């Protein structure tokens, strides 16, 4: 994002920030468009988005951290009922995102919806979040919808196998030697 400092217009900067916010929250364009200050709550010392998906009506509760919290603080207004992000149409947002991506040397076709995929895969899944939790955060009614996002990469498989190995080794080390011998004979 640092390389995009020459972004020309205020509108383009808002789109960039909203896109990044979506990368760290999983909110869709339409849900971000309707995000208001009353959807932001302080719960247990943390900021949360408490809302409902526009598309499905399912409840969504997303804890804000790091980059997303920083972006929110730059756009949060005290006026209740006011949208946090004043965004142009989805088509204009996608056009701006394309321009921004080219300016920073990314030449793939990226749309606002790509941010939602980024959250599901790069942010959540690759950091060990379960598919069930991701499904809830994305506001999906069915896990099968979430599985579209869940491309499993080798790193995740390797980390999961490592955790499994450590757990089994830990359990095995707690068994006395006599029981270990009987377990080995079974196999």
Label every PLM stretch briefly.
Residues 1, 25, 34-71:
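Conserved tyrosine-mediated DNA breakage-rejoining catalytic core shared by Y-recombinases
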Residues 1-29, 78:
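Basic, Lys/Arg- and aromatic-enriched nucleic-acid-binding interface segment
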Residues 6-11, 51-61, 82-89, 107-114:
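Short, contiguous acidic/charged loop-to-helix segments that flank catalytic cores in large enzymes
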Residues 13-16, 88-91, 107-127, 140:
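Short basic/aromatic active-site micro-motif
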Residues 20, 24, 30-31, 99, ...:
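C-terminal catalytic core of tyrosine-transesterase DNA break-rejoin enzymes
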Residues 53-57, 90, 138-163:
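Catalytic-site neighborhood detector that most strongly recognizes the C-terminal catalytic loop/helix
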Residues 54-73, 79-99:
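C-terminal catalytic core of Y-nucleophile DNA break-rejoin enzymes
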Residues 164-187:
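C-terminal secondary-structure termini that scaffold catalytic or DNA-interacting sites
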């Amino acid at each position: 994002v640092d390389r995009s400092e020459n972004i020309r217009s205020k509108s383009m900067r808002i789109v960039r920030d909203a896109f990044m916010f979506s990368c760290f929250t999983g909110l869709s364009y339409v849900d971000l468009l309707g995000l208001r200050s009353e959807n932001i709550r302080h719960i247990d010392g943390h900021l949360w988005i408490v809302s409902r998906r526009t598309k499905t009506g399912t409840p969504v509760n997303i804890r804000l951290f790091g980059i997303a919290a920083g972006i929110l603080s730059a756009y949060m207004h005290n006026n209740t009922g006011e949208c946090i992000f004043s965004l142009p149409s989805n088509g204009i947002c996608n056009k701006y995102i394309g321009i921004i991506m080219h300016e920073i040397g990314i030449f793939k076709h990226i749309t606002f919806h790509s941010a939602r995929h980024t959250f599901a895969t790069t942010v959540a899944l690759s950091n060990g979040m379960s598919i069930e939790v991701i499904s809830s955060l994305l506001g999906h009614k069915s896990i099968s919808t979430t599985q579209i996002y869940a491309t499993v990469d080798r790193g995740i498989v390797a980390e999961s196998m490592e955790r499994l190995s450590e757990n089994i080794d830990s359990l095995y080390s707690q068994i006395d030697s006599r029981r270990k011998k009987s377990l080995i004979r079974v196999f």
